[in-house]
């Protein structure tokens, strides 16, 4: 049996480190309390997204960040986030335009509030900017914006590539094996 698996099977110590902020997956995550208490804050880094094992989309805020310390010499120290989740039944997705909105007042009643830090994607909740009484129903909804990881470029999508390259335009010395597609 792998030594790290054996160490995890023994269980974790009864002490864990707690953090106000933690860097993971190219994001800087903060607890919601830390975000609210910072004077002159310029960013809100406590909102997260996670795809559940049930296939539902979970959005919420980080309440606590813990580093669990397992017994043994292997140094297994997983980071977990305790989150306050929004009710996944109220999430509205329009994949064709990449639009997601959530009802912030609708809280998830389940007990599974922990996720591994590696599972988290940072998001930002943007309230609708409308104040007109005509659109009063929109005021309870927030639009979800998925934050790009720092110092990482998003990988190109299939539609970013040209489907065919006209090799006649290429220098034969650079690509001698290329044949014309026309």
Predicted regions and their residues:
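Terminal interaction-prone segments of large eukaryotic proteins
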Residues: 1-182
């Amino acid at each position: 049996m792998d030594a790290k698996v054996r160490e995890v099977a023994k269980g974790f110590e009864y002490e864990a480190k707690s953090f106000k902020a933690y860097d993971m997956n190219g994001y800087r995550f903060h607890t919601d309390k830390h975000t609210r208490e910072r004077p002159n804050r310029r960013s809100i880094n406590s909102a997260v997204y996670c795809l559940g094992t049930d296939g539902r989309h979970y959005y919420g805020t980080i309440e606590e960040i813990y580093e669990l310390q397992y017994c043994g010499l292997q140094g297994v120290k997983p980071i977990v986030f305790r989150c306050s989740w929004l009710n996944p039944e109220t999430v509205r997705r329009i994949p064709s335009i990449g639009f997601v909105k959530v009802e912030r007042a609708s809280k998830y009643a389940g007990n599974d509030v922990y996720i591994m830090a590696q599972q988290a994607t940072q998001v930002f909740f943007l309230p609708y900017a409308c104040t007109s009484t005509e659109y009063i129903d929109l005021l309870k909804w927030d639009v979800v914006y998925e934050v790009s990881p720092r110092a990482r470029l998003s990988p190109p999508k299939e539609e970013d590539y040209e489907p065919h390259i006209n090799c006649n335009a290429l220098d034969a010395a650079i690509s001698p094996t290329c044949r014309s597609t026309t």
